């Protein structure tokens, strides 16, 4: 079970926390861990919902259809690092796959949190091993960063 005390242990060593997904962002906010970058689409398991209420400073809007990684979305992931934080990337379409370029591009030590439907939160601390695995997946998808 995710609690603020066990998240505190995980998050204390990271200078950047990224949430991918509306429910994931909402969970982190409710536990007192506002993400530095949140990627949301106003949907939960493809059902329309209100996006989480958060105090983001910068907003990037992109189009990214289901099961795709568009150039526009990839650029937004890259651009978010240079915006005033916290940043919301709002996706018209689907945000799920954006965890992959985030893991491939963001600094080592970044915490990336996303949801596994009907299971719970997945928390990854970017290291060289996970980055290499994700780049292999992106290459198989013919995605160039």
Model-flagged regions — what are they?
Residues 1-131:
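Conserved mixed alpha/beta catalytic, RNA-binding, or beta-rich assembly cores of soluble enzyme
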Residues 126-145:
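Charged phosphate-binding loop/patch that engages nucleotide di/tri-phosphates or the phosphate backbone
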């Amino acid at each position: 079970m995710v609690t603020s005390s066990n998240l505190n242990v995980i998050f204390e060593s990271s200078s950047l926390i990224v949430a991918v997904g509306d429910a994931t962002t909402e969970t982190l906010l409710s536990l007192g861990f506002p993400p530095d970058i949140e990627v949301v689409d106003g949907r939960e398991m493809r059902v329309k919902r209100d996006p989480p209420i958060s105090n983001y400073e910068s907003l990037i809007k992109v189009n990214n259809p289901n099961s795709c990684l568009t150039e526009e979305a990839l650029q937004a992931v890259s651009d978010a690092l240079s915006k005033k934080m916290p940043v919301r990337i709002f996706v018209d379409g689907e945000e799920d796959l954006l965890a992959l370029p985030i893991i491939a591009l963001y600094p080592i030590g970044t915490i990336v949190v996303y949801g596994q439907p009907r299971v719970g939160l997945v928390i990854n601390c970017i290291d060289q091993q996970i980055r290499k695995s994700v780049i292999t997946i992106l290459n198989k998808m013919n995605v160039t960063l």
